Every structure is written in structure tokens, then in C-alpha cells.
């Protein structure tokens, strides 16, 4: 069912582990709400609806990837990093189940730039992010491979339904 699909996706998507239980429940619900529209559509209508939002797919994928990187590098830390908090908020916006609510690539770039200007971002916060990214490259690659394997298994199991 759609409920099962949403529940399993949220549970297995390691990028979401850094988010609160209440956020994950809300995200799961938004997936169900969005996918319900396809129940009354023909296969062709569903494909057309999905393809209408192809320009948001890369942004969605990159946002999941960066959330995974953040999880791998910073999950155990309790230190507040202004850049990280705001960047995570931007990424969350771009993984919205409803593609109409995701930012365009252009708007994402603009929003990203304002993280440096509007927030008066400290160079130390961004530098800390880059240093940890460099130090944890191997863990990041391993985590991405694990996530790919998990998603392939999910895809196979749901394809059989």
C-alpha cells in the first residue's frame, strides 16, 4: 500500500535519521498525501504527472546526498553550527514529497548564497563544515554505497508488488 511504501521509505532512508520523530511522521504523511492522487490516474496520466517535475529530481537527489553527508559527519556532535542548521533547512525544503513545494535549482542557489550574506555567516562555521567533509570522505563514500544498496533492495521488493 501507499502507507507501507511511505513508512518503509522513511524508515530506510538514512538521510532522515538526523531528523526528529515528529518530522519523520509528518514527512511520511506528506508522501502518502502526495501519492494518493495517483490511485485514480491511468498509467499514462501518472507518468505525465511525474515527468512534469523532472527539473526537481536532481535537487531532490543532491539534497538527500548532502543530508547523508551531514548525518555521517555531524550526527554525533551537539555543537551548533549556523551554516549547518540553515543548510539543513534548505535541504529539507528540497526533499518535500510534493515537487511543487521544492525550490528550483536557481532559487536553491540564491538561497544558498544568502546563507553567507544575509546570515552574516562566520567563516569558521563553513570552514568547520569543509574540514569535516574532507576528514570523513571514506565514511561518506561507504555510507552512500550502503544507502544505494538499501534503495536498490527496496526498489526490487516494491517492484514485485
Pin down the residues of each PLM region.
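Helical subdomain adjoining the active site within ATP-dependent kinase catalytic cores
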Residues: 1-161
Amino acid at each position: 500500500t501507499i502507507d507501507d511504501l511511505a513508512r518503509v521509505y522513511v524508515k530506510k532512508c538514512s538521510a532522515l535519521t538526523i531528523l526528529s520523530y515528529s518530522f519523520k511522521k509528518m514527512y511520511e504523511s506528506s508522501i502518502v498525501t502526495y501519492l494518493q492522487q495517483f490511485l485514480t490516474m491511468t498509467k499514462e496520466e501518472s507518468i505525465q504527472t511525474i515527468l512534469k517535475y523532472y527539473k526537481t529530481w536532481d535537487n531532490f537527489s543532491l539534497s538527500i546526498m548532502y543530508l547523508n553527508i551531514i548525518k555521517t559527519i555531524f550526527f554525533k556532535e551537539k555543537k551548533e553550527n549556523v551554516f549547518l542548521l540553515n543548510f539543513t533547512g534548505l535541504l529539507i525544503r528540497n526533499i518535500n514529497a510534493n515537487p511543487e513545494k521544492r525550490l528550483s535549482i536557481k532559487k536553491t542557489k540564491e538561497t544558498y548564497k544568502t546563507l553567507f550574506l544575509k546570515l552574516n555567516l562566520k567563516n569558521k562555521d563553513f570552514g568547520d563544515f569543509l574540514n569535516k567533509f574532507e576528514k570523513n570522505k571514506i565514511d561518506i563514500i561507504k555510507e552512500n554505497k550502503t544507502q544505494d544498496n538499501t534503495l536498490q533492495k527496496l526498489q526490487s521488493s516494491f517492484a514485485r508488488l
